[in-house]
Regions:
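N-terminal glycine-/serine-/threonine-rich phosphate-binding loop
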Residues: 1-63, 68-78
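Anionic group-transfer/hydrolysis microenvironments
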Residues: 37, 89, 143
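Short, acidic/small-residue loops that bind anionic groups at enzyme active sites
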Residues: 80-97
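Catalytic core of DAGKc-family lipid kinases
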Residues: 93-160
Length: 160
């Protein structure tokens, strides 16, 4: 049985209608982990702290838009957890499954009828006096902006 974390974007899934629909479809077919903040829904799932939602998961299903995937991409990449995106947004470059196709797509997923598409990650570092102050990975983009009051910023970009 697959162990699946479910992360909804509750500003796109009003009343968590689609999240409930997904969980009801998955019940009995997978172990489901969801943020304990949603325990008021009374769903038959494993409620865990938001910070621990990926600890037991083999897969992540995101209901939302590309931004919802981007929020979790680096952590999932570190843990080698594939992400399945169900689009509740407008365009959905990364959330490839439309909500109307959710049950069909999830059925195929549960039967291992899918391929994992690997995406390249970027690594960004913030350095001061040639020492790394902060380092992180990103999937889609990294935004660089200057600190208030600074006139110039120095950037170095490299690829390999």
């Amino acid at each position: 049985m697959k162990r699946i974390a479910v992360i909804p974007n509750n500003s796109k899934d009003i009343g968590l209608v689609n999240t409930k629909r997904l969980v009801e479809f998955l019940n009995g077919k997978a172990e489901i982990y969801i943020d304990e903040a949603y325990s008021v829904l009374g769903l038959n799932v494993n409620y865990v702290a938001e910070s621990e939602i990926l600890d037991n998961a083999e897969y992540l299903i995101v209901l939302g838009g590309d931004g919802t995937i981007l929020q979790r991409a680096a952590e999932c990449a570190k843990r080698k957890i594939p992400v399945l995106g169900i689009n509740l947004g407008k365009i959905g470059f990364m959330t490839e499954i439309e909500i109307d196709d959710m049950e069909d797509a999830i059925s195929k997923f549960l039967q291992d009828d899918f391929t994992v598409e690997k995406r390249m990650m970027m690594k960004a570092e913030i350095r001061k006096e040639n020492k790394i102050q902060f380092s992180f990975h990103a999937l889609n983009d990294v935004v660089v902006s200057k600190v208030a009051g600074e006139k110039l910023i120095y950037m170095e970009l490299s690829t390999d």
